[in-house]
């Protein structure tokens, strides 16, 4: 849980200690301002607080940093400050209809309508156009026949009328009255001609219908396959260059994309599917369905998919459950699992009906859990201190021990005469970016995802599933087996107040981590490991660092809600102390932490001490018999000789020691670094642990063998390193052993995989770690920070232990202070 100021000796050995203090706590440009990487633009970061001790957070106007993208993106129009120019442009647009965008769109739409109404996409005439052309040609062929027919008809009428007239006028015998046609005969003749005319007109009217029938019987496509002609490289002159489809067109009601039918497209504005089996060539029947053979094909495809899924899904479920069962037997690795399969095989054979309907879907419902391994799944809504016991077994065994050097759990641990040898579970239930960078590295720097608060807020509704998967995968039962096998005997478990409750608009995932904490304690019991409870984040944040949950202002005992959060933190301890005062935890939870690293360099010291006294009395009143720890607050340990003299009994002072956050210590070479531990730290810890010359029983709750600050996100997300001179913006000072003499220090070696470490470097790392074990062993003992990391090899006890630069057994180191410092071979000092 390191931060950029975690060592109590942070200011000792500085070239200018006062400058360094001002840099961090007064008006540090590193914290106040960031710079644009390309433009070197200076701006205040979001959520920046001018003074960590201030009660209010000023807001800044983002308009000062308004960014105009036109210079970089030609698609973004430049802003014009020429008002007259813009007025002239608008007037020209109004005078010329072609210059008007909307008019251009309408013209383009009309032109495209005429074009699409005549020609298809391939440049060939549409069906409607061909029909019109056929009818035109047929009409042209029929026109001469009609004219001849009408001429013959007219001549017959004239001959008939002339003959009748001659017969009436003639006096010849042949034309006498006895031979004249009667009126009836003339009427019959006239009727005959009329019937002939009617038949001809009927034939003319029938001709278009017959022609349409002949067209329906024509083949739609020929024997040879046809392809659409490609679009021309250049638009023909006079033809509009309209888009195929345009968002503006659609918004203004222009035609949709044409739905093509085989043989050519329908007219523009037409988007109807034709039923291919019985289309009669008309535009009616807009409700026609797709052809039967197409519907049948899709039904076949859907049926095949259903059958495949019916086979695949059960097989996948069975394999997933088998995988989870195998993990239970062998103990899965605690490395991050990239699969999304939950560990729920223990639900097999159980009925969801065993969970009361009122509790189904709640935090007490195992069917909502991502991981059910080693939980008691028998439902109970019983609580202690308002906290659920769901998942716990009703019996337990405290006869176990991790090794023969340690008494079993049901016997007292000899604190003071035998040192604690423990590890932390950092980054697990209280997330820290440098331990689990995979949760943070996929976001842009603009998102400002820098801690668990901003991460959960960004994840939104998926926060619970994402965070619980991390809980289930990051630490498993196998880790506790490995801790035992490494010779360790204590585990300091980090958790935060949102394991119990959340307040106001907290985005944290509430209450899920509680059951993982309880299961971890049961794993510790199983392998004889004693537990140190460590509340890492309390309401309001006790230090404003990312590992408290939220980076920024300290809101605990400080600011507008300082007293409110003081009470909330006491309420938190009231609940968890009642819970862990149960008899089942008496032998396994032997150290009880109050709050991790309150920043007493910024908080009123008396307020912190008064709260510490109140909290200790509260938890002891509730039945806690474990040792209660108070952190040194980063004050010089010598000051604690006079502090909390009238404290309650059974308390430990907790100090955290690192060399890499102090610029006077990070520059030490390998040998001098070991000397610092065995000379200065050894005597300092030994003295503070005594009641006569120091404070009393003291533990070192955090330390590591890291000799650089190179790990990703170690100094906060987006922050550089002291080792390479990138830690402070505007200050490129390099803090490493060869900074003045060369060669240049690089993080490449420190961040390399452990398999690439040289034998000399591994020897140094192990000696460096064992020297600290020796120094802290002069007091109550130590807890290494931390057990497991995703990639920071120098911060993972497990990685060091498995790769040969940590003692095989923590209780049997190869080096102790007082021994000759071994040679590290040709190990370069910049390594």
UniProtKB/Swiss-Prot annotation:
Catalytic EC class:
hydrolase
Q: Write down the chemical reaction(s) this protein catalyses.
A: Successive hydrolysis of beta-D-glucose units from the non-reducing ends of (1->3)-beta-D-glucans, releasing alpha-glucose
A single MF term (Gene Ontology): glucan exo-1,3-beta-glucosidase activity
| Function field | Glucosidase involved in the degradation of cellulosic biomass. Active on lichenan.
State a single Pfam family of this protein: Cellulase
According to the record, the segments passing through the membrane are 298-318
List the catalytic residues: 597, 702
Query: Which parts of the sequence lie on the Cytoplasmic side of the lipid bilayer?
Result: 1-297
Q: What membrane topology term does the record carry?
A: Single-pass type II membrane protein
Q: What is this protein called?
A: Probable glucan 1,3-beta-glucosidase D
**GO cellular component terms?**
cell surface; extracellular region; plasma membrane
């Amino acid at each position: 849980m390191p931060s950029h100021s975690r060592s109590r000796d942070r200011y000792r050995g500085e070239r200018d200690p006062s400058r360094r203090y001002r840099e961090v706590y007064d008006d540090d440009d590193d914290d106040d301002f960031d710079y644009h990487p390309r433009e070197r633009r200076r701006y205040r970061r979001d959520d920046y607080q001018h003074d960590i001790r201030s009660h209010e957070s000023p807001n800044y106007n983002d308009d000062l940093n308004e960014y105009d993208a036109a210079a970089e993106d030609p698609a973004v129009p430049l802003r014009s400050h020429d008002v007259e120019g813009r007025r002239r442009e608008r007037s020209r647009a109004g005078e010329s209809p072609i210059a008007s965008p909307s008019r251009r769109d309408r013209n383009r739409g009309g032109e495209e309508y005429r074009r699409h109404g005549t020609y298809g996409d391939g440049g060939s005439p549409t069906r409607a156009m061909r029909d019109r052309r056929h009818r035109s040609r047929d009409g042209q062929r029929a026109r001469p026949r009609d004219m001849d027919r009408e001429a013959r008809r007219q001549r017959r009428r004239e001959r008939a009328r002339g003959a009748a007239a001659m017969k009436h006028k003639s006096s010849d015998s042949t034309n006498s009255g006895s031979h004249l046609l009667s009126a009836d005969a003339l009427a019959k003749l006239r009727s005959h001609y009329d019937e002939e005319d009617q038949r001809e007109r009927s034939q003319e009217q029938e001709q278009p219908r017959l022609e349409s029938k002949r067209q329906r019987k024509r083949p739609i496509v020929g024997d040879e396959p046809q392809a659409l002609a490609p679009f021309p490289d250049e638009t023909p002159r006079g033809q509009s260059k309209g888009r195929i489809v345009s968002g503006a067109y659609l918004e203004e009601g222009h035609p949709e994309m044409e739905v093509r039918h085989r043989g050519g497209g329908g007219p523009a504005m037409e988007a109807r599917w034709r039923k291919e089996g019985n289309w009669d060539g008309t535009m009616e029947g807009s409700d026609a369905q797709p052809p039967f053979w197409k519907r049948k094909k899709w039904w076949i495809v859907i049926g095949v998919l259903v059958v495949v899924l019916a086979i695949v899904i059960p097989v996948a479920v069975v394999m997933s459950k088998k995988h989870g069962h195998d993990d239970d037997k062998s103990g899965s690795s605690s490395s991050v699992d990239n699969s999304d399969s939950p560990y729920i095989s223990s639900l097999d054979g159980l009925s969801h009906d065993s969970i009361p309907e009122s509790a189904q879907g709640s935090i007490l419902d195992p069917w909502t859990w991502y991981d059910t391994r080693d939980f008691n799944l028998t439902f109970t809504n019983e609580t202690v201190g308002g906290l659920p016991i769901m998942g716990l077994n009703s019996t337990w065994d405290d006869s176990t021990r991790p090794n023969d050097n340690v008494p079993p759990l049901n016997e007292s641990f000899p604190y003071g005469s035998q040192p604690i040898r423990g590890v932390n579970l950092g980054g697990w239930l209280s997330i820290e970016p440098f331990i689990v960078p995979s949760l943070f590295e996929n976001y842009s720097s603009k998102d400002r995802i820098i801690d668990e608060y901003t991460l959960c807020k960004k994840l939104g509704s998926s926060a619970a599933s994402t965070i619980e998967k991390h809980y289930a995968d990051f630490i498993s039962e196998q880790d506790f087996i490995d801790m035992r096998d490494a010779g360790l005997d204590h585990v300091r478990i980090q958790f935060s107040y949102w394991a119990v409750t959340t307040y106001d608009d907290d985005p944290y995932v509430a209450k899920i981590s509680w059951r993982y904490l309880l299961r971890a304690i049961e794993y510790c019991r199983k392998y004889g490991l004693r537990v140190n409870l460590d509340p890492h984040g309390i309401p309001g944040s006790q230090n404003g660092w990312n590992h408290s949950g939220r980076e920024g202002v300290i809101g605990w005992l400080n600011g507008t809600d300082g007293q409110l959060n003081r009470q909330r933190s006491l309420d938190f301890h009231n609940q968890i102390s009642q819970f862990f005062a149960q008899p089942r935890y008496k032998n396994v939870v032997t150290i009880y932490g109050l709050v991790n690293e309150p920043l007493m360099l910024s908080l009123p010291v008396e307020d912190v001490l008064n709260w510490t006294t109140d909290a200790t009395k509260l938890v002891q009143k509730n039945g806690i018999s474990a040792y209660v720890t108070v952190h040194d607050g980063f004050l010089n340990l010598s000051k604690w000789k006079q502090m909390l003299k009238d404290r309650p009994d059974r308390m430990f002072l907790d100090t955290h020691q690192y060399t890499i956050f102090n610029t006077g210590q990070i520059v030490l070479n390998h040998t001098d670094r070991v000397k610092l531990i065995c000379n200065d730290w050894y005597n300092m810890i030994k003295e503070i642990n005594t009641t006569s010359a120091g404070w009393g029983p003291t533990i070192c709750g955090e330390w590591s063998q890291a000799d650089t600050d190179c790990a990703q996100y170690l100094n906060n997300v987006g922050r550089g390193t002291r080792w390479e001179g990138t830690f402070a913006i505007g200050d490129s000072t390099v803090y490493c052993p060869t900074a003045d003499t060369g060669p240049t220090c690089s993080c490449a070696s420190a961040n390399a995989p452990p398999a690439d470490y040289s034998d000399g470097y591994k020897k140094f790392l192990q000696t460096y770690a064992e020297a600290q074990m020796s120094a802290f062993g002069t007091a109550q003992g130590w807890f290494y920070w931390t057990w497991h990391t995703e990639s920071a090899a120098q911060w993972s006890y497990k990685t060091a232990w498995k790769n040969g630069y940590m003692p095989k057994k923590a209780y049997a180191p190869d080096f102790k202070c007082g021994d000759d410092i071994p040679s590290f071979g040709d190990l370069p000092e910049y390594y």
